[in-house]
């Protein structure tokens, strides 16, 4: 099975997250995409102190109508800081025969050298970097950490960066939905509409639970 992996705080999950997952699923012929909410993100504080359980429930509501999507609570169960390398190793142990595709945003990929054991990620899975409009796979190569750049070679026929492990880095371009969780939180705090930015079921959950009313 070809398994996509999309992590994040999902605070809250929104339509751009879903569209990115769907485009990756379609373009790279993924059988499933698993959404993995972070319990304790290591690189930034969790705004609003929203519980893991609430964020997990919003993701479950968001993906309920898509049979190609699934949700995992593994980072909440594991506890501690939610390092990607630990999650990927756990997934690989659970799915030893599956091909993993780790979906990350361009900003995160640009900072990947700051991640825990970042070099080991490429030996565990393929990486799909969601690029800003107009970016290319060659520009992606330019931000590879110097320490591991020699492990990759550009494959023009497949338009990807091949890693010596047999995995590859792909550039997913053209996802044009400019939606952010921080903007949604501000809209809720200001009493404004968030319709069409998030799934209806998630909007209803936010209203019922009075989430983000005092968000900063």
UniProtKB/Swiss-Prot annotation:
GO terms for biological process: NAD biosynthetic process. This is Probable nicotinate-nucleotide adenylyltransferase. Its EC number is 2.7.7.18. It comes from the Bacteria. The keyword Chaperone does not apply. Belongs to the NadD family. The keyword Membrane does not apply. Keywords: ATP-binding, NAD, Nucleotide-binding, Nucleotidyltransferase, Pyridine nucleotide biosynthesis, Transferase. NCBIfam families: cyt_tran_rel (TIGR00125), nicotinate (nicotinamide) nucleotide adenylyltransferase (TIGR00482), PRK00071.1-3 (NF000840). It holds the Pfam family CTP_transf_like. Pathway: Cofactor biosynthesis; NAD(+) biosynthesis; deamido-NAD(+) from nicotinate D-ribonucleotide: step 1/1. SUPFAM superfamilies: Nucleotidylyl transferase. It is an enzyme of class 2 (transferase). The gene is nadD. It comes from Geobacter sp. (strain M21). One of its GO terms (molecular function) is nicotinate-nucleotide adenylyltransferase activity. Catalyzes the reversible adenylation of nicotinate mononucleotide (NaMN) to nicotinic acid adenine dinucleotide (NaAD). CDD domains: NMNAT (cd02165). The lineage of its organism: Bacteria, Pseudomonadati, Thermodesulfobacteriota, Desulfuromonadia, Geobacterales. It catalyses: nicotinate beta-D-ribonucleotide + ATP + H(+) = deamido-NAD(+) + diphosphate.
């Amino acid at each position: 099975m070809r398994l996509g992996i999309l992590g994040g705080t999902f605070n809250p999950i929104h339509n751009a997250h879903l569209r990115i997952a769907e485009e990756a699923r379609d373009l790279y012929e993924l059988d499933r995409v698993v959404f993995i909410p972070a319990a304790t993100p290591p690189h930034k504080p969790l705004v609003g102190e929203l519980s893991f359980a609430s964020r997990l429930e919003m993701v479950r509501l968001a993906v309920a109508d898509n049979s190609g999507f699934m949700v995992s609570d593994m980072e909440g169960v594991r506890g501690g800081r939610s390092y990607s390398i630990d999650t990927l190793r756990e997934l690989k142990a659970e799915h030893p025969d599956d091909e993993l595709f780790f979906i990350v945003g361009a900003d995160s990929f640009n900072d990947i050298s700051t991640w825990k054991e970042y070099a080991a990620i490429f030996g565990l899975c393929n990486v799909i970097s969601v690029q800003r409009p107009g970016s290319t796979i060659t520009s992606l190569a330019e931000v590879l950490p110097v320490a591991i750049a020699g492990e990759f070679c550009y494959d023009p026929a497949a338009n990807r960066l091949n890693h010596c492990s047999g995995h590859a880095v792909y550039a997913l371009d053209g996802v044009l939905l400019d939606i952010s969780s921080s903007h949604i939180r501000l809209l809720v705090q200001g009493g404004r509409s968030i319709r069409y930015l998030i799934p209806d079921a998630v909007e209803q959950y936010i209203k019922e639970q009075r989430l983000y009313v005092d968000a900063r």
